[in-house]
Amino acid sequence: MSEFSRRSFLKTACISVGALYAGCNNPVSPKQDASAPKLPYCDVLVIGSGGAGLRAAVAARKANPNLSVVVATKMMPSRNATCMAEGGINGVTDFENGDSYKLHAYDTIKGGAYLCDQDAVEKFCEAAGKVIYEMDYLGTLFSRNEKTGGVAQRMMGGASKRRCNYAADKTGHILMHSCLDDAISNGVKFLMDHELLDIGVMDGKCEGVVIRDIQTGGIYPLLCKSLIIATGGYTRIFYNRTSTPFIATGDGVAAALRAGLGFEDPEMIQFHPTGVKNGGTLITEAARGEGGYLINNKGERFMQKYHEKAELAPRDVVARAMEIEIREGRGFGEGLGAYVLCDVRHLGKETIMKKLPKIRHTAMLFENVDLVDEPVPVRPTAHYSMGGVEVAQFDDMSTKIAGIFVGGEAGCISIHGANRLGGNSLTDAVVTGKLAGLGAANYAKGVANFTDGAKTHELAQQWQAKFKEVTSGGGSVNEMYALREELGKQNWDNMGIFRTQSKLDLLAKNLDEIEAKYKQIRVPNPNEVMNTAFTDYVELGNLILLSKCACLAAQKRLESRGAHTREDYPKRDDEKFLKHSIVTMNDKNELQLSYKDVVVTEFSLDGRKPQ
């Protein structure tokens, strides 16, 4: 980088940070007059600052610039799972190669093992093609096709055509900064270092949330006319081995469940085939999309015997194949340290440096391996939540509770079914995030006045009392962190890639014991300021709750479908289980399981391509 460009970069970065912090000044209660409520408030509140949250916030502001739109986030807006999505963003823009929106929908539905709601998928795939042009126009620095000058595309697992648009292997990072710049430019306000505790609902309508300022420790009600949940997934239930950030603890999903919304398909959790051996950080699918091989200890490209698309088979197929190789003695190492190899050396240094620079850095950082010279050890890692808050309709991402909307991985509409295709997650974030923002803005416009916030204020008082209870008395934070590690191990051992009834029954028993221990835990630090141990305590409670939901649904789904592989029920059973699992919580805080039918339109269940 030249001296001039470095200076320009730093200048731009400083301007962006300054603008962001300017957006943090007085973000709530934008006007004070006789009609304003006594409690803090904003018109549209977005929880979560990933791609979905920022797209939602911008869409709401553009739909109605008079609305006050606030994004609450546990960390800096740029610290999220969107930044970690490396491979690309799906969307059909090249129709000359035989691709179409319908073919994208077919691949998505087939890859999702037909648990996708087909009406939603068709709308999603049409919107996906259009959003690529929108993000390109916004200034997203995509890699370019050297022949046409258009956005460059690569193959991804389960795809019939090249439709994954990319920016080297940093697509999510680049996309995230485009969305953040757009949000700042459009007057979106930010509450950084704030965590969601609960959602207040009165008479079937959202009245606000209980939120905690991590910096000061203040726990208070925040009223809003409409709420957008964009908190991402819950794969941190596999705490010891996941590719997602530490903040991906399903806070929004857990709060929605307690507020009365359904948790749809919680058992459907994707294991990405290639996480680094130590910890599970992602080696992007772009490595295989560019032609990388998976190699066992015999030096064989083993994927060719499992699927016709070899390394580019759907993720659930590749993950299972890798685990089978390891279980049958053709892997390297032992136990949780076992692995196979991902080899891209044959691509050459120039291609690796141009198209895969980030994963080269990741391999060096976590495994001390240079991909130019040697393969990197990999093993499946918990990566994506197909399940999420039950969404009522795709067009505005609304829920059954008036005023609550959901965007991105936190929701389940169900676009991804039982297994998400690579490249569809970023598309999901930008498409459903925008729809949620438009829906929330439209709803807020029709709400004349804020409620008095009685329910939300009551919940805030309960959480204030909870803080005092948990942070007083004896105990040790080490007990809490040991319990968190145990939760991750139990989930991985018994609800991982291969599941059985006996394993799931054992997990249910162990989760009850973990929950009982959690209720006795104390975090002996009454200091309210930057008490991150209490933040970890809240997150652990959410992870335990969501683990129990996933286990319950997995116990009762007596089939194998997508990411849900039952060794004791190895076949897909459309007659009994072409249904979505819906977990709800009753007034006694007991979990209940019900089902609803999958929406089937023109795509047959036998794998035939549409005409």
Task: For the regions a language model picked out, list residue spans one by one.
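Glycine- and aromatic-enriched mobile tails/lids
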Residues: 33, 40, 51, 56-59, ...
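Core beta-strand elements of the Rossmann-like FAD/NAD(P) dinucleotide-binding domain
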Residues: 40-42, 217-226
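Conserved redox-cofactor binding core of oxidoreductases
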Residues: 134-218, 230, 272-279, 294
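An anion/pyrophosphate-binding glycine-rich loop and adjacent beta-alpha core
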Residues: 255, 261-377, 439-445, 485
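Glycine-rich active-site loop/strand segments that organize a redox cofactor
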Residues: 91-124
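C-terminal segment of N-terminal export signals and the immediately downstream linker at the start
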Residues: 23-51
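N-terminal secretory signal peptides and thylakoid transit peptides that target proteins
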Residues: 1-17
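Glycine-rich loop(s) and the adjacent beta-strand/alpha-helix scaffold that form part
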Residues: 226-281, 422-439
